């Protein structure tokens, strides 16, 4: 068990679609509440799958959150009473790749615990640059796995489907959706975008 320090830190929860990233984020935030620490959570405006203004896991767990367009919007919502800052679906924010690293490092340097969740790879199995940069400087990185819908192995890839077939390589990188558009797949069952 990792003992949390009293100083600032960055924690990253990553993985493919349906790996339980938001559920794990909500679990950690519930522990923060039990410790009577004040928190603020953020969710991207682009994430329209569930309730705007809430972090919502695929199994229905939820936490109230502020809606933002950019990671740079987070400091404006903070006050001196906040101990923990949480950001869900980081890869959906409209920012240059280094913005998340800069903002999260600044918050951690100010003594805050920063917990970020998001996809580590896009549907092409390429790293999301913002997540990759943040993972490099985080004190803790937890990669979660889903179950491959094809063979039952641990899944590490998000297969985007269009009419039941893998999306082409030139499809937009960001398309918000759930089981109607994506499947969790292992390396062997993943079909590269062409």
Curated annotation (Swiss-Prot):
Zn(2+) binds at residues 148, 151, 186, 189. ATP binds at residues 15-22, 88-91. GO terms for cellular component: cytosol. One of its GO terms (biological process) is thymidine metabolic process. It comes from the Bacteria. Belongs to the thymidine kinase family. This is Thymidine kinase. It comes from Roseiflexus castenholzii (strain DSM 13941 / HLO8).
